[in-house]
Amino acid sequence: MPSARLQQQFIRLWQCCEGKSQDTTLNELAALLSCSRRHMRTLLNTMQDRGWLTWEAEVGRGKRSRLIFLYTGLALQQQRAEDLLEQDRIDQLVQLVGDKATVRQMLVSHLGRSFRQGRHILRVLYYRPLRNLLPGSALRRSETHIARQIFSSLTRINEANGELEADIAHHWQQISPLHWRFFLRPGVHFHHGRELEMDDVIASFKRINTLPLYSHIADIVSPTPWTLDIHLTQPDRWLPLLLGQVPAMILPREWETLSNFASHPIGTGPYAVIRNSTNQLKIQAFDDFFGYRALIDEVNVWVLPEIADEPAGGLMLKGPQGEEKEIESRLEEGCYYLLFDSRTHRGANQQVRDWVSYVLSPTNLVYFAEEQYQQLWFPAYGLLPRWHHARTIKSEKPAGLESLTLTFYQDHSEHRVIAGIMQQILASHQVTLEIKEISYDQWHEGEIESDIWLNSANFTLPLDFSLFAHLCEVPLLQHCIPIDWQADAARWRNGEMNLANWCQQLVASKAMVPLIHHWLIIQGQRSMRGLRMNTLGWFDFKSAWFAPPDPE
C-alpha cells in the first residue's frame, strides 16, 4: 500500500480510537475503517512493521486482542503534512490539515530557498490564484509578469533600464515608414516539444489584430525562411517595442485546441507551467530554452488568500525565522486613481467631479487610513510620482447630490479599504456611496453602469512608451473618456505626442484623479543574488540565483 494511503488509514484509526490503547477485535476495527476483516489484518501488520502500533492478536471465539498505539495520529499528520509541503502538494495539505492558521504557519516556515536533488527551488507566497495567463486577454499586474516568464516575443524590453533587446528576432530593420522586417532565430522550441515555425508567429499577430494598439498592422508575410515582413497602415516608431509586449507574445498556432491553455499555457520562454491550481502555480526551468537557461530550477507560488487582508504591499519570499531577510522596495510607477464615467449624468457633471476630487483628495484618504496603510501609501498628484499635475481646489457640494456609485474589481483588498474610506468621508457630507465589486474581465470591458471607477495602474519601462500603451489598451478607459483615441494613437506612434501634457489634460478635466502611489516591497533572502524588483513588484526569475553558504 502506498505510504500516503497507509498514513491516512492510521490517522483515521487513531481518531476513531481517540488515541487510546484498548482491547478490541478485528471485526470491530474493520467496521471503524469500513473494510474487510482480512484487509484490516493486513493494515495492522503493516502499521506494526512501520512501528506505529502494536497488535497483540488473541486466537479463539470471544477473545479480544490488544491494540497499543506507539505513535500519535497528530505526529503522523504533521509528518504527512511535511511530506506534502516538500512535494508542493498544497491542495492535499489544505485538505489534510484543515485549519487555515496552521496551514499558513507551515507555508511561511517553508518559504524561500530549497535545495532538493541538486535543484534550486524558490517558494513564494501570494494572496490569490493566477489562473489566466493568456497573452492578449485582460491580465492583471502579476499575471503580466508571469506571462513574461512563460512566453517569448520577437523583441523584449530590459526590465532594469527599459532598453529594447533581441528575443526570438535577432535583428530587425525599418525598410520604409510602413514596412518593417524581422529576422528570426531557427531552432526555437515550444514547451511541448514542437519547433516554432513562421506560421506560429504569423497566427499570433493575426490573433491580436483587433486590439487597438495592433489594429494598424495591415499584413504579415514571410518572404524567405525565418524572415518576417510587417506592413502597416500608418507609421509607428514604437513597433519594435510593441512587439515585445505581452499581447504580442508567440503562441503555438494550435493553442485553441490545447486543454486549459489559459491556465496551463505553452510558450517558448525560460519557464514552463507544470501545475496551476487555486492553491499553487508551479513553473519549471525549460532546458531547451533558446536563451540562457534559468538559474533557479523551479518556482512555486503558493496561494494563501488569508494574507490578502494584510497590507504587506509585496511578495514574501522568506519566513519570519532563520536566514536574515533582504528587503527591497520602490515607489510604484503608477497609482490608484478615480475614473469618472462620462456615460452617466453624475459622472459627466463637472461640478460633481470637482467636489468629489476635493473631498476625496489624496491627503484626506491617507489621513483617514489606518497606520499600517499610511506607511505604504504616498499621496499622488499625477499618474507618475514625478508629476504634479493635480491641484486641490476647494469646491462646493452640488445641489441635490445624494448618492454615487463606485465600482472596482474584486480580489484586491486595498480597493475595499480605499472604498471604505471614501464611503466614510462621503457619508459625513450626506452622500451615500454604493459600492460594486465585479470580476477583472468585467472591469476591463467596462460595460457596467457606474458613476466612478476605482482603478490602479502600474507602468513598465520605458515609461514614455508604456504609459499611453497601457491606457489605450483598456476598453474601460475608452468608454469613460470621450476623446479621439485613434487620433491620439496616431500622434503617439509618430512621436508627436507630449505625453506629460496629454496626461495633465486628463487630470485637469478630472477624467482621471490620481489618489495614491504605493510602495512595492519584496521580502527576500540575503543569499539570493540578481534580485532586482521591476515596476510590477516582481523580479525576473531566470536572472536570480542563490549563492552557496560561506565555507567554514
From Swiss-Prot:
User: What are the GO MF terms of this UniProt record?
Assistant: DNA binding; peptide transmembrane transporter activity
Entry-linked SUPFAM superfamilies: Periplasmic binding protein-like II (SSF53850)
Please give the DNA-binding region boundaries. Answer: 26-49
Q: Which InterPro entries match?
A: SBP_5 (IPR039424), SBP_5_dom (IPR000914), SgrR_HTH_N (IPR025370), Tscrpt_reg_SgrR (IPR023767)
Q: Which UniProt keywords apply?
A: Activator, DNA-binding, Repressor, Transcription, Transcription regulation
Q: Where is the HTH marR-type domain?
A: 1-116
Entry keyword annotation includes Transcription regulation: yes
Give a GO biological-process term: positive regulation of DNA-templated transcription
User: Which segments carry the region annotation Solute-binding?
Assistant: 163-492
Q: Signal peptide span per the entry?
A: none
Q: Pfam families in the record, alphabetically?
A: SBP_bac_5 (PF00496), SgrR_N (PF12793)
Q: Which Gene3D superfamilies match?
A: Periplasmic binding protein-like II
HAMAP family attached to this UniProt entry: HTH_type_SgrR (MF_01449)
- Role description: Activates the small RNA gene sgrS under glucose-phosphate stress conditions as well as yfdZ. Represses its own transcription under both stress and non-stress conditions. Might act as a sensor of the intracellular accumulation of phosphoglucose by binding these molecules in its C-terminal solute-binding domain.
The record ties this protein, via PANTHER family, to: HTH-TYPE TRANSCRIPTIONAL REGULATOR SGRR, PERIPLASMIC BINDING COMPONENT OF ABC TRANSPORTER
The molecule here is called: HTH-type transcriptional regulator SgrR
* Organism per entry: Shigella dysenteriae serotype 1 (strain Sd197)
